[in-house]
Amino acid sequence: MMLYATSHGSYTIRFHLRLDQRIDDQKLRIALDKTAQRYPYFCVSLRRNEREFYYEMNHSPVALLHTNKAITLGALETNGHIWAVCYDQDDLFIDFFHGRSDGTGAYALIATLLYYYYYDEQDIPGIKTLDTPVSDQETHDPVDDLPLLDLSKINFPVPPKALNLMETSGLKHVGGKGLILKLMIPEDSFLPFTRSNDGTPGIMLSVLIARAIERVHPEHELPLVSNYVVNARPMLKAEDTFHNCTNRVVFHYDDRIRQMPLEKQCTIYRGKTFIQADEETIVRGMTVAGSMAQMILDLPDFSTKAAVARHAIEGTYEAASYIVSYVGKWKYPQIGRHIREFWTETPVGPFPLIEVAAVNGNIFVSFLQPFQDRRYYDALLDELKENGLEYVEYGMAPVCVADIKI
């Protein structure tokens, strides 16, 4: 659905890793070729006709480009592929078409790439290599196993419009694909604080950002609502699938929660996560999403599909004030020790999107926003300071992600 809604060509994601040494392009080329061989389902081109998008196998090498600038996937410079690797000095960039997989799927790819770059012959449990064949569980989409619903017979409640920060503050879109503000929080400062307040990194950041927005708009009238992205693979019993398997938990920061101390707020958010991310609820939500996607696929032509998908996505945008996405802590410390920084960039919608990565003892917060003004980000820094948390700022820059040519 998102694919058709963003058919203007920017539904991509860039993972920006700063490594511990200057990159050897020859070693990286070898690592990239082995990684591409391990992930044939990512080595495709995206095509479209008058009716639909579709994938086509691409046997050309995955592009390796010496640049830190934005590139175009699906174009000649990237051999028509939906992903590519760029580098500049000690900076590594993985550009990836988000319609093919989510952050969990992309992390597996990145782990394999870094494994072949740094280790190759040494066994690191859990990393997919050429010695671990692609399984049926890896390629199967669990949503295909869910029943299709007749959505015309279901009366879905319309969620109320949430507080929109741009509208409330009268801010203008900065242009391009938005801005990224980079913030690093040491784990040895953040994790004990998070645990002592009954939180997790993603939940704690969701709460702190809500409190930050309250600092700026203490008298707001529209509800302050956030979405927290969760990995649905465990609930769908499809831990190994590469397909997009995300769902969202909805947090309402209402008057009752506003009056609570931080620990109680985190407890409430944990409870909401437990209830909304249980197996039955997730399967029900993914069934609706899968049915909606199939309904769009069954529409007669491309333009109709794009219009319906865009309308559906815009409805979800109006129901949230911001989104927090946290894939989870990096699983492979042998590789993680080589990663100095880990930033995640994606085009920004009508509200802030906070992408969180945790690796090598640090939490990297990519605060993505569609406007120039820093008031909400600065309010988050005030929350960190008042709670005695350490942090390091890495500046602000335009979001630099690939377009995709179809």
What does each model-identified segment do?
Residues 1-52, 60-84, 215-406:
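Acyl-thioester-dependent acyl-group transfer interface
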Residues 2-6, 72-73, 78-80, 85-86, ...:
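Short leucine-rich amphipathic alpha-helices used at interfaces
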Residues 100-108, 112-192, 384-406:
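Non-catalytic, low-complexity flexible loops and terminal extensions
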Residues 77-119, 129-139, 357-376:
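Histidine-centered acyl-transfer/condensation active-site motif
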Residues 20-39, 95-111, 180-219, 324, ...:
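Acyl activation and transfer enzymes in specialized metabolism, enriched
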Residues 87-89, 199, 318:
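Short, well-ordered loop/turn elements at secondary-structure boundaries
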